[in-house]
Amino acid sequence: LAGIGPGEAVRYGIFGDIHGNFDALEAVLAEMDKQNVDEALCLGDIVGYGAEPHRCIQKVREIGCICLAGNHDHAAIGKLDIDFFNLYAREAAVWTRAALEPEDREFLGSLGFVEHLPNFAVVHGSLHGPEMFNYISTIFDADLSFDALDKPLLFYGHTHIPLTFFDTKPMTYTMDAEIPVGDGTRTLVNVGSVGQPRDEDPRACFAIYDDAIGSVKITRVEYDVHQAAQKIIAAGLPEALAIRLEMGK
């Protein structure tokens, strides 16, 4: 990543929901380099579901970017009750706990819930009780985060579906890939998922925010999805997690 000097315009690469998918993470980071991203931000859920949690944590730490806690990160270190997880998510959380090194657990335990930058904020799930990992899936959910937002812009993840809400009257939303954010309308942008997309597009997904021109682009990256799915099966994780990865749902 290019790095920035004081007062310079910045291209941010904002990504999350990696879910132990190292192949997808590598593809996203390579695309960020290609797209001249200056600074990366990770919205959490580095682990869970996928077969390479340790490698994903190592890579995120190596980048040295701002990183937030996701619910699966907390589940993997015993900071979140997994009884309400579905069966496959529970199995993956238990498997992930055993796969982590002590330094991985320490890192995941050190992550915060919200980060405020000069003209935007980032969170894993919702600004409405960020430590509860609530979802922003509906206009009602979005309204709660707008109430808590004191910046023009929020980036979030958690649902694995790129969806943008605009604080217009009435509220509007879009799934467009090109999002204008510089006109003063407060905006919530879901950046999609690197490692387990759920909008029926299996490509790795993240956002590029160019603060100089006031634009966000939801960016998709091809990678070897089948290889990542085979790693899930080889690790002894539920086969359903591999199948859904290839289907993007």
Regions of interest found by a model, annotated:
Residues 15-16, 40-45, 66-71, 123, ...:
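Active-site neighborhood of phospho(di)ester-bond hydrolases with catalytic His/Asp-centered motifs
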Residues 7-12, 116-122, 182-187:
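Beta-strand-turn-beta hairpins that frame and shape the catalytic cleft
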Residues 7, 167-249:
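Acidic, His/Gly-rich catalytic cores of divalent-metal-dependent hydrolytic chemistry
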Residues 139-189:
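Anionic-ligand binding region
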Residues 56-57, 62-150:
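Active-site neighborhood of divalent metal-dependent phosphoester bond hydrolases
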Residues 27-30, 55-58, 81-84, 136-137, ...:
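Short, glycine/charged-enriched secondary-structure capping and boundary segments
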Residues 19-24, 48-50, 74-77, 128-130, ...:
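Active-site environment of divalent metal-dependent phosphoester hydrolases
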Residues 1-65:
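N-terminal active-site segment of His-dependent metallophosphoesterases
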